[in-house]
Amino acid sequence: MKKGDLRRQAILDTAEALFFERGYEETSVQDILDAMELSKGGFYHHFESKMAVLEAVSARRAER
């Protein structure tokens, strides 16, 4: 797996955990960034929005 793919998966893992813990509405992109010590640019390189992350988390869970 490429470094970018690993970063994308890490964002999804972190977001999924925060969505479960706090709920989607109560989780901000900044919360995800803070939990990962990730820059906004690093986040937006992989996802265009928090909704895009939710869609990717949902798709990944549907594949399991």
Predicted regions located by residue number:
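Alpha-helical structural segments
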Residues: 6, 10-17, 21, 35, ...
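Short helix/strand-capping hinge loops at secondary-structure junctions
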Residues: 18-27, 47
